[in-house]
From Swiss-Prot:
Enzyme Commission code(s) on record: 2.8.1.8
Name of the protein described by the UniProt record: Lipoyl synthase
Chain sites annotated for binding [4Fe-4S] cluster 1: 60, 65, 71, 299
EC main group: transferase
Organism annotation: Methylobacterium nodulans (strain LMG 21967 / CNCM I-2342 / ORS 2060)
Annotated region (Disordered), positions in chain: 9-31
A GO MF label: metal ion binding
Keywords assigned by UniProt, alphabetized: 4Fe-4S, Cytoplasm, Iron, Iron-sulfur, Metal-binding, S-adenosyl-L-methionine, Transferase
Pathway as given in its UniProt record: Protein modification; protein lipoylation via endogenous pathway; protein N(6)-(lipoyl)lysine from octanoyl-[acyl-carrier-protein]: step 2/2
InterPro entries attached to this UniProt entry: Aldolase_TIM, Elp3/MiaA/NifB-like_rSAM, Lipoyl_synth, rSAM
Required cofactor(s): [4Fe-4S] cluster
Catalytic activity annotation: [[Fe-S] cluster scaffold protein carrying a second [4Fe-4S](2+) cluster] + N(6)-octanoyl-L-lysyl-[protein] + 2 oxidized [2Fe-2S]-[ferredoxin] + 2 S-adenosyl-L-methionine + 4 H(+) = [[Fe-S] cluster scaffold protein] + N(6)-[(R)-dihydrolipoyl]-L-lysyl-[protein] + 4 Fe(3+) + 2 hydrogen sulfide + 2 5'-deoxyadenosine + 2 L-methionine + 2 reduced [2Fe-2S]-[ferredoxin]
Domain (Radical SAM core) ranges: 72-288
Biased composition (Basic and acidic residues): 12-31
Gene symbol of the encoding locus: lipA
Length: 320
């Protein structure tokens, strides 16, 4: 049996203790259309240095994103706030599970300084789930947004938030901080929630996105899913309809990649032509922007996509 360990303070501890009892699931060889360049360029090294100097966590590293080499080469990093330990135990996710430490009051300033040092025109801020906090970390999100606005006024801000389940008023706090894009991922179709995302509720997540538009109709909303988890095509199409009923603007669809033998297995590698078909269908259903490729991830090309998103809204208004 394989147990994934982290080396912290010279002590090995399980990264995913809740998964240690599970039988190993073989990791399939990736098809040729899922190949990426190994990180190591000068841009990557500079991004890595700035992240380390500021004592920050990135979802690029913690989630094992396949695009880290490409993004960090361009000095694009997605900062993961409120620590590196999540209170949830999703079957697809490589982020450490456990009891998190208290919030770091200096983190907003460090994130803001790193954004300025990297010269980011657009930044994505995400977080672990913090079910242990009264507001789920909403106030910390707002503090980070405020600090970035002060340190780098020209930077547009995208947040990728947890679901704030049973955190009354938390969403209002984040929306009031005025991020340019509010992203919350559904991750998968509802039939897979019990095994893939057991701590979450599908229709709560849909309602969260709908509520953002009620609070601020001008705010761009975004959501993403993974395919290859055993979902059926008709389920993905219904999910698109659910998101459009919540007036979500931007949909991302990418291939699920299994982090370790203890995680949910890849049921299928979806070929590129099926991603193109999903993209065509999603546009027909009314999304302003769709990104659907095997390597699509929520924050991949986020800055360029934000520019496209703004233009798509202007184009639609012009033809209304």
């Amino acid at each position: 049996m394989a147990v994934v360990l982290d080396l912290l303070a010279n002590d090995a501890r399980p990264r995913h203790p809740e998964k240690a009892h599970r039988p190993d699931q073989p990791i399939q060889r990736k098809p040729d259309w899922i190949r990426v360049r190994a990180p190591g360029s000068p841009g990557w090294a500079e991004t890595n240095r700035i992240v380390r100097e500021h004592g920050l966590v990135t979802v690029c590293e913690e989630a094992g994103c396949p695009n880290i080499g490409e993004c960090w080469e361009k000095k694009h990093a997605t900062f993961m706030i409120m620590g590196d330990t999540c209170t949830r135990a999703c079957a697809f996710c490589n982020v450490r599970t456990g009891l998190p430490q208290g919030l770091d009051g200096d983190e907003p300033a460090r994130v803001a300084d790193a954004v300025a040092r990297l010269g980011l025109s657009h930044v994505v801020i995400t977080s672990v789930d913090r079910d242990d906090l009264r507001d789920g970390g909403a106030g910390h999100f707002a503090a980070v947004i405020g600090a970035i606005r002060q340190a780098s006024p020209g930077t547009t801000i995208e947040v990728l938030t947890p679901d704030f389940l049973r955190k009354e008023g938390a969403l209002d706090v984040v929306v009031a901080a005025k991020p340019d894009v509010f992203n919350h991922n559904l991750e998968t179709v509802p039939s897979k929630y019990l095994t893939v995302r057991p701590g979450a509720r599908y229709f709560h997540s849909v309602r969260l996105l709908q509520r953002v538009k009620e609070l601020d109709p001008t705010m761009f909303t975004k959501s993403g899913i993974m395919v290859g988890l055993g979902e059926e095509r008709n389920e993905v199409l219904q999910l698109m309809d659910d998101l459009r009923s919540a007036e979500v603007d931007f949909l991302t669809i990418g291939q699920y990649l299994q982090p370790t033998k203890k995680h949910h297995p890849v049921k299928r590698f979806v070929p590129p032509d099926e991603f193109r078909a999903y993209e065509t269908t999603a546009y027909a259903k009314g999304f302003l922007l769709v990104s659907a490729t095997p390597l699509t991830r929520s924050s991949h090309h986020a800055g360029a996509d934000f520019a496209r998103l703004k233009q798509a809204r202007l184009d639609r208004l012009a033809t209304a």
